[in-house]
Amino acid sequence: MQERYQPNSVEAAAQQTWQARDAYLVHEHAKNPDGSEKPKFYACSMLPYPSGKLHMGHVRNYTINDMMARQLRMRGYNVLMPMGWDAFGMPAENAAIKSKVPPAKWTYDNIAYMKKQMKAMGLAIDWSREMCACDPKYYKWNQWLFLKMLEKGIAYRKTQVVNWDPVDQTVLANEQVIDGRGWRSGAPVEKREIPGYYLRITDYAEELLDQVSTNLPGWPERVRLMQENWIGKSEGLRFAFPHRIAGADGKLIQDGKLYVFTTRADTIMGVTFCAVAPEHPLATHAAQSNPALAAFVEQCKLGGTTEAEMATREKEGMPTGLTVTHPLTGAEIDVWVGNYVLMTYGDGAVMGVPAHDERDFAFARKYGLPIRQVVALEGKTYSTDAWQEWYGDKQAGRTVNSGKYDGLAYQAAVDAIAADLAAQGVGEKQTTWRLRDWGISRQRYWGTPIPIIHCADCGPVPVPEQDLPVVLPDDLIPDGSGNPLAKNEAFLSCSCPRCGKPARRETDTMDTFVDSSWYFMRYTSPDNDQAMVDARNDYWMPMDQYIGGIEHAVLHLLYARFWTKVMRDLGLLNFDEPFTKLLCQGMVLNHIYSRKTPQGGIEYFWPEEVDNVYDAKGAIVGAKLQRDGSEVNYGGVGTMSKSKNNGVDPQSLIDTLGADTARLFVMFASPPEQTLEWSDSGVEGANRFLRRLWALGYAQREAVGRGLATGADWAQAPAPVKELRREVYGLLKQADYDYQRIQYNTVVSACMKMLNAIDDAPLPEGPAADAARAETLGLLLRVLYPVVPHITWHLWQDLGYAEHLGDLLDAPWPHVDEAALVADEIELMLQVNGKLRGSIRVAAKAPKEDIERIAAAQEEVARFLEGRPPKRVIVVPGKLVNVVG
């Protein structure tokens, strides 16, 4: 055994042995030595995009997964921990444009490097199940399921106003528009009308909502709430404002009815205007004869189409000059075009009730529109000068200024108004959803080809199943001018499957969220080229633990749930939900340093380039560049980012201090679900702990060898031996509990305390002490093994544990020796007249009389009682003894 800890050689030796043994190859229905079947556990991290290198967020995510997998294997579970690559998407195209190489080469080069990094981390991944989204063997099944959905009417083609990213030249889903900008390019999003394929996720809205509310107790509450809000079920009333507005053909536009939806039917008598979306037929009609309105409509097409984007945008409008009729009062109501109204939500029109809706109130104040109060609350004074929250209190209010509906409570007013509108044939109660069908068509090259052929005679024709996959050419180099598939004759040219005439392939590819909606099931059946999934999927799924970032709460997780339900309804699955438990790990943060450039931009500096300036309390208040002493701004801590020069390269850390140091730090520094603030001193502390562990093993190697060979009778062991065993087993019990709670930072803390206890124990020489050293160090190595597998495995080998107990890879999780936790002696606090004066040690089962006698005989008692005899002695069992005199 080498005297000093050398992480590179230790980790290389461990990994070579594990790879030669195929240590992490997993099979279904694995058996115990007695022939019984092991329980299964499927633990999976969200698959990475192969961007080039791992970042510390990856290291944290995968180490959490690896700790869980290793510890559960020790507990006797058959654990699956797979890995794959979310390999399609725009970044590969952008990189290809920049480097002038095909996206396929860039992607596969990155995969090779990142896979090497993952292996260097010592992750217990079954690489035989690896999948890659850009492999035709994988995306064939995207295409196959799309065709099945097309047959069932779940997939369909339509023309609709969409979010268009002018830089990436593609359609974005609502969820991919952040603050009015494309989530990848950052470009302002435009609205365009374009044909594409959609999936009817709205058909599953009720089930998606019901199950996320009631059937996912293992998910974080905030994620469930985010999905509930995104699905957005609303119970309300859909009704029409009649009108006589005719189009150029002389027919009434939309049959003379402007439909709106409201959840506040009790306020209908307060409508003073209606607003329609810029794409609404009434807006289009009015704009034909109004140049100013036409210009406003075009302006509205800039920006996204999400509710979140609309909520932050300044509300603007323009009158159309058109009016509709209030269905209950007969009053003429002005129609406006509003930039905050979405054509894709409801009927593309809203009623304006300024007195009882904050958005409408602001709009009416801005444009001088009437504000009519129709709900009053006792004790509240109505005013049109400023919005007051009580206006929206529907339960406490009563209707006013509402004719025959005056004096009604919310539900009574809703029911009465709904009944009258229904009787007129212009209204009915209805449930609506914020959720919209999922548009999957993308005008980009690097994605799954949509298996459709366009024929001049037959129209869009599905590619026959036997012709799948439609293979994406992997040698194209994008030039930034749109989709290169549209210029590739070899891909485009084909024959119509229906009539045999020359035809053209669909050039749109699928949204990359299609790839990530089911990859975790392909891990279970990776080698099946005849079916999307097979019986092995029934064995592993649903997944027991999914691990990933909170940023995927709405996008990926909602789509994966929908995809699972579609596969179930097609007879491919026998379960409803894909993920039983979800852990959202916190971000990794680091310090941010910057200053403005002369050109008005911002220049960021690496933390190692600066020296911090501290205040009297030790807080960072500024920084100076090391190279010239000039000042830079300290921006606090934020998520590690290449753009802000505050990332830490995991490879550099692995090369210098080892993967175990990186793993130990990211697990110890913070609970898994909370943010982790990077600390160089914390990393050094983690490495120092590992050096101490190695030094302890080296120092006690001979004693451990003797102890493993001889054992001991613990009942007859000296008191220091019993005390060490009691302390270590107590820490084992705590670590065991914390492993089950996924509180891995406190697991590491327990291991550090174990090391201190073993290192500091004043053990006498002899067989019992040797056996105690062997036992307690062996316990520490097993508890610590899931965190830092390389050093613990190597010490296990070098110290002789493998010879006596087998390979650490196969070692069972240690059981707590309850007998070791029972103390022969206990310590009681000693008080004299209620004040703490020391402590005494007594037999754990000492009778009260013995405790009183021992306490009264203490020197401290005589001194503080000044020689007087005690009047009485009070014993609080297991805690203290108080001598009163």
From Swiss-Prot:
InterPro entries referenced in this protein's UniProt entry, alphabetically: aa-tRNA-synth_I_CS, aa-tRNA-synth_Ia, Leu-tRNA-ligase, Leu_tRNA-synth_edit, M/V/L/I-tRNA-synth_anticd-bd, Methionyl/Leucyl_tRNA_Synth, Rossmann-like_a/b/a_fold, tRNAsynth_Ia_anticodon-bd
Family annotation (SUPFAM superfamilies): Anticodon-binding domain of a subclass of class I aminoacyl-tRNA synthetases, Nucleotidylyl transferase, ValRS/IleRS/LeuRS editing domain
Keyword Nucleotide-binding attributed: yes
Reactions accelerated catalytically: tRNA(Leu) + L-leucine + ATP = L-leucyl-tRNA(Leu) + AMP + diphosphate
GO term, biological process aspect, one: leucyl-tRNA aminoacylation
Single GO term (MF): ATP binding
Keywords linked to the UniProt accession: Aminoacyl-tRNA synthetase, ATP-binding, Cytoplasm, Ligase, Nucleotide-binding, Protein biosynthesis
Motif interval(s): 'HIGH' region: 48-58
Record EC number: 6.1.1.4
Residues making up the signal peptide according to the UniProt record: none
Locations listed in the record: Cytoplasm
Gene3D superfamilies, sorted: 2.20.28.290, 3.10.20.590, HUPs (3.40.50.620), Isoleucyl-tRNA Synthetase, Domain 1 (1.10.730.10), Valyl/Leucyl/Isoleucyl-tRNA synthetase, editing domain (3.90.740.10)
Binding-site positions, ATP: K642
A GO cellular component annotation in the UniProt record: cytosol
The keyword Phosphoprotein appears for this protein: no
Family listed: Belongs to the class-I aminoacyl-tRNA synthetase family.
PANTHER family from the UniProt entry: LEUCINE--TRNA LIGASE, MITOCHONDRIAL, LEUCYL-TRNA SYNTHETASE
NCBIfam families: leuS_bact (TIGR00396)
HAMAP family listed in its UniProt record: Leu_tRNA_synth_B
Protein name: Leucine--tRNA ligase
The organism of origin for this protein: Bordetella pertussis (strain Tohama I / ATCC BAA-589 / NCTC 13251)
